[in-house]
Amino acid sequence: MTETNSRGRKIEVVGEVISDKMDKTISVLIYRMVKHAKYGKYVKKTSVFKAHDEKNQAKIGDIVKIRETRPLSKTKRWALAEVVETAKA
């Protein structure tokens, strides 16, 4: 899901837009694989992040890349970096 390094670079992740009903904000669903502590099986986990979309360009179903940023509101700590793939209508 995330790539961390000691240089302080911003983390970027790719996910799917699940909501664009808010003004200049999108909800992005992120999938990641996590190894179960006891059994060792890899399990798919999901997280939902709110991201800032200044131009309201992302739509539901789009695959987007979001970048970590300073806190913009109570729940918004990500910003839209680019739309990787548009939704098929």
UniProtKB/Swiss-Prot annotation:
The keyword Ribonucleoprotein applies. SUPFAM superfamilies: Nucleic acid-binding proteins. Pfam families: Ribosomal_S17. GO terms for cellular component: cytosolic small ribosomal subunit. Keywords: Ribonucleoprotein, Ribosomal protein, RNA-binding, rRNA-binding. It comes from the Bacteria. One of its GO terms (molecular function) is rRNA binding. The keyword rRNA-binding applies. GO terms for biological process: translation. Belongs to the universal ribosomal protein uS17 family. Part of the 30S ribosomal subunit. One of the primary rRNA binding proteins, it binds specifically to the 5'-end of 16S ribosomal RNA. This is Small ribosomal subunit protein uS17. The lineage of its organism: Bacteria, Pseudomonadati, Bdellovibrionota, Bdellovibrionia, Bdellovibrionales.
